[in-house]
Amino acid sequence: PASDRASLCDEAIRLARLLLRMYPSEPEIMGLLALMLLQHSRIAARFDAQGNAVLLEDQDRGQWKRPLIQEGLALIDKALRSRRPGPYQIQAAIAGLHARAARADDTDWAEIDGLYQALERHAPSPVVTLNRSVALAKLSGPEAALDLIAPLAPRLDGYFYFHGVRGSFLKQLGRNAEAREAFNRAIALANTPAEAAHIRQHLDSLSA
């Protein structure tokens, strides 16, 4: 339930604040707390009244909690001034760019793509590259994004999000049969009913 998620986030933020008080000049702890605050700021907009997941670009930004955003942005700006970047700082900087955009169309995807490339250098993983593909699709189109994630298939075949993202790119290209297959695979791997329902919406929107 949403209340349980909020309680867990509140507790995680409380612990991160304690950690920062113990190590007040550690930029990665600042980055961790900033990331938590920025993510928690969107919690009210992440699900609709039926409990279905709402994509970041479709969320009502008026529901985002501005005090948490302002605190998170101030923390990440302070952390980055140390010039000792790390994975948490980079992830928080990405979240910060989303938070700074008044509308989804205002998102600085070029900067986000660059930050994901930095994250790939600091903490390389197929999931980081998959996340970067979303930014690349906005910049260079879904074909380029598909090319980026194609080598990830063997390692991410059991990952719900991989097939959902891949299906979205295929759908944008009009490759509906392949998109349908990817979405069905994502539904089979979904961890929650909300995840499955979200993918089913994409599946239902495909033309026969």
Model-derived features: where do they sit?
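Start-of-helix register in tetratricopeptide repeats
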Residues: 28, 87, 91, 127-128, ...
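Residue-level signature for tetratricopeptide repeat
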Residues: 36, 62, 99-103, 135-136, ...
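Solenoid-like repeat scaffolds
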Residues: 21-22, 81-82, 117-122, 151-157, ...
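Amphipathic helix-loop-helix modules that constitute alpha-helical solenoid scaffolds
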Residues: 1-117
